[in-house]
Amino acid sequence: MLSMVLPFMVSAATPEGAEIELQTNVIDLGVLSQEDDKQIVRLSYSNTGDLPLVVTEVATSCSCTTVKHSREKLMPGERGSMTIAMDPAKAPEGMFYRVLKVYSTARSGVKHITLKAEIKN
């Protein structure tokens, strides 16, 4: 009976697929004025899985934040990056929190990045 259970346990512990690991999942831009220039952040990520990874979309929740990213395949072990731009002039005054959703072919599903700042007039 043990020989039937052991192969199942081994295969369950090593699923195949792409996996995305973000450099960070929180970006703190600090205190900004609505008159400040766009804030540009480059965020790196890597494919820690064993199949190719493609970032298919990075969704933002407001017009003050944009993201540019590559849609090229990342082989296992390779790194990529995305450029996140936030325009304080388009952000409301006060504490600013936005969640970016990273959609990819990773087996773990959608990853979230929190962008935060304090916006002053």
Model-derived features with residue positions:
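Surface-exposed binding patches on compact interaction domains or structured appendages
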Residues: D50-R79
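Terminal connector regions
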Residues: P92-N121
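Beta-sheet-dominated interaction scaffolds and their linkers
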Residues: A12-T48, I119-N121
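Short, acidic/polar linear motifs in exposed loop/turn regions
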Residues: T48-L51, K90, A106
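Buried hydrophobic-core signal for structured, non-transmembrane domains
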Residues: V41-N47, I84, R98-Y103, L115
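Bacterial N-terminal signal peptides
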Residues: M1-F8
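Short strand-edge motifs at loop-to-beta-strand transitions and within beta-strands
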Residues: I27, E78-I84
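Short, solvent-exposed loop/turn segments enriched in Ser/Thr/Gly
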Residues: E35-R42, A89-V99
